[in-house]
Amino acid sequence: MAQIRVRGLADLNKFLQDLPVKMEANILRGALRAGLKPIKEAAVQNCPVGDPNDENRIKYGGYRGALRDSIRISGRFDKKQARVIARLIVGGKGKNGADVWYAHLIELTGAAPHSLSWRHTEMNHPGFRPKPFMRPALDSQANNGVLAAADYIKKRLATKNGLNTADIELGIE
């Protein structure tokens, strides 16, 4: 992974420390969300898309691309620990009502071949290999995410707080 060298962040940090806590938290939450956007876009591009079978379509409301559509960014301010948290989430119930409970299986573990039995019938499931899409997205877009977060802070301080950020240079070494 390439090193990221950002010049001028000491000035940004000093100015951020002088702001009220609520305003600082809002800026940092926005910066973290901006930093996660390139990673989210790469995860959406890498995400495997397939048709669900009829049973899963009925039981869980699945549709083609439900896993891809369940990728989202969440951000909040934890008042107890005074920190900003941003997460890139995949799975769970999506906006369209599909329950993508299997996201961790596709990303991490896959499924071993096994047999299924019901009503005196037996079927062999061939299993599947994991198809990671979140980790490769993070690996490929980490630098762009850091630059996007720093750029967001720079623009936000210039527009909303009147700080002259023209001398702050951002770039990858």
Each predicted region: which residue ranges?
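Short, low-complexity, charged/polar segments at coil/turn and helix-coil boundaries
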Residues: 2, 14-17, 23-125, 155, ...
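Small-xxx-small helix-packing motif
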Residues: 8-9
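Exposed beta-sheet edge/beta-hairpin loop segments within beta-rich domains
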Residues: 126-148, 157-158
